Amino acid sequence: MRVALIHSHSLTYMGGGETFILRLARALSGQGLNVSIYSLPIGRRGGVEVKGLLGPVDYREGLLPEVDADVAYVTYFPMASLALLRVRAPRVAAIHSPLLLPEAQDQGLFRGGPAALLNRLGAWGAYSYYLHGAARLELRRFKAVHAYPHLVNFVRHRRVYALPPFLNVNRWRPTREKDEEFKVLFVGRRAYEKGFDLFIALAREARGRLGLKARFLATGGREGEVTDGVESLGFVPEDELVNLYSSAHAVIYPTRADTFGLVVLEALASGTPVIASDIPSHRLPGLPLLLARGVDGALRQLVDLYNMFYSDRERYLELCRRGREAVVRGYSEEVVVPQYVRMFKEVASGLSP
């Protein structure tokens, strides 16, 4: 079966959505499917090569691609995905942008007028938010919609597939012992939407007001630079990220908008607890996330982890083990990818789920 994965941004952007498409392509190819990726050239970054990451998967980037496939999986972008596609195969709309589901996000993100939202979300984010209502009508033109299980109640369509993301748990695993220096990690874009300002405030409060002897580390920025007590790690390739997660004592995921952050799965699978913002998108059954509201809530959770590590080590390590076990049980590639294969076969053949 020929599967086309059609993405709204260049894979060179290398955000969470792009990473998901790369992993899905490799996993489907490993299941014997003939997979091609077609990307629009939005957000293209020079000097980033992705074809070497795809193995036998064909990758094409451009406008109005001629898509030849039995079924197409389209990361939905309002009023653009269909206009910029020429594909006759049955289509599955994939809801990966959190701004298409504003009810599941931090409502403070959407306060203010267009100028405020443009500043917080950027041009494409604001565009998606303002058109999310029209998107619900446009989705009728797709044979099916894919949404993550905890978000399906926010999606209106006659045929919704509730499938989680997945991870290669043999690759993402504990590879380092936790040393005695407590390390707190942020992984992601340094954007307001991602809550990087909250991480900075958390570091300032924890180190300053409470005097926690901890290192606060963040990917991105200029390597070696220290600002407000946060050490910048620069770009961290995936091979090194596995070790980074594993050696950290806590991962902070304070994003204000999300569908399902891969950071959560990567960290838990690597044996590290995750403190995440308490938004509907993070209320994930079966995953032992430590949910927190604002800086004060995250600070309380962090202090609890800090004290647990130094005063009740076995309880802390049990929390680490529980996180990995939950990912292996419900989100491993072996468990989840066959569900995607079944979805594509049903949509391509016109069968009911």
Tell me the role of every PLM-derived stretch.
Residues 176-194, 200-204:
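Conserved donor-binding/catalytic core segment of Leloir-type glycosyltransferases
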Residues 273-276:
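Short hydrophobic beta-strand element within catalytic cores of glycosyltransferases
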